């Protein structure tokens, strides 16, 4: 189950209220690295859909629904602690329609659009490979944020208004299209599979491999996905 998954399961068993969820085990990571993405997604598909349905029932909301949306986080969880070495995606399930559902539920447009722009940025970095690989590279999302703040005459992110955050989302998605040649995914399940695979991929990223060598952590252990 990995560290996060095991601890969450244990807290749940002793009655501590934790958000509902599920864990894809470290064994699947090993299979992923052996069989490849397409085969593992095919093998996992039905189980993940059933697990999401269980979370939907507990949360009384629907993944990808525009009226009563369920958002999820997707996190790594190795057996040994590897802080900051692997990847996380938050607010997954958002798109242009779902964000309006969040506004209707919360009554807070700024919260909804800020969550959305953070999700697009995080997904672009982690799943779509737009994160800079060294200090010399410019982060396209951070560059856009600075450009918009300058145009609006503000210095801090939290000074941006709802319409500014909407502009950020639009510009972020245009940057995704320009850099990847593809539109930002709007289907919740397409987003989910991208995130699951990105977490498995992060087990073999350069910084994680180096950290494991330094700490004596075997490559074969793999990471869980929560």
PLM region spans:
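Nucleotide/phosphate-binding sheet-loop regions of phosphoryl- and nucleotidyl-transfer enzymes
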Residues: 1-226
